[in-house]
Amino acid sequence: MRRRAGGGTPPSGIPLPSALPRPAGSTPPPSGDPSGAVPARLGLLPPPEEPDALEAWYLNRTPFDRGPLAGATWQGEIDRAVLWLDALPYSGRAVELGAGIGFWTVLLASRGDVSAYDAREDRLTRARQRLLAHGLKAHLHPRKLLEGPEGEPAGLVLLPFLLSQLAAEPRAQQVEVAHSWLAKGGRLALIDLAPPNLDPSTLEQATSEMLGGRFTEIVSEPLGRHLILISALAK
């Protein structure tokens, strides 16, 4: 499993169900770390912080994974995630928490009103440039993602590559915050990294544990080697 330069921690995927053992050979969290996450597949590093590196991560232009096959499957799964998000039904405005460089913001803006939030202004600057290049508009806000909602309740809240990078406590807080943004019956959409060797039959249990009791009609789908798509409606 590849690690960040300088001895950083390995990437994390969506947590496995609490009742299941970790896959053989996976890296356990450090002592006292309640993250409940496991390393992501094929050595994919988590989303980088810097805008240029994040662009490369999405486009797979640098060796974030092991070899050309992994790169090809990554891009194919990203393309499928785009089609999935574009087809998700919702009404009202969309909110994106962790918008980054605006990769998904452009798609949401093409469908209607969207407010996109990220903790870093430099990433939102890149998102603004991407929107302008497509002739689209969105409300971009530099803001901590755990802050409470503003404006009218949303019909869709998107969390792209966010929950898998959080330890258990902030992950639960982020799910609670995402729920607070939504109107009753509003849709939560997650696009995130998969853990290695995840049995699809356990994915529903893992997702239900992660989302708690705030959502219904939970649908989760592993795309293959890298990604998981999750949709749920707010109670």
PLM regions: where:
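A conserved beta-strand element that flanks and buttresses the S-adenosyl-L-methionine
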Residues: 158
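Class I SAM-dependent methyltransferase core
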Residues: 96
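A short glycine-rich, Lys/Arg-flanked "PGG" loop and its adjoining helix->strand segment in the class I
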Residues: 172-184
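Short catalytic micro-motifs in class I SAM-dependent methyltransferases
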Residues: 161-162
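Class I (Rossmann-like) S-adenosyl-L-methionine-dependent methyltransferase catalytic domain
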Residues: 2-92, 100-134, 142-149, 168-169, ...
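Conserved H-loop
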Residues: 137
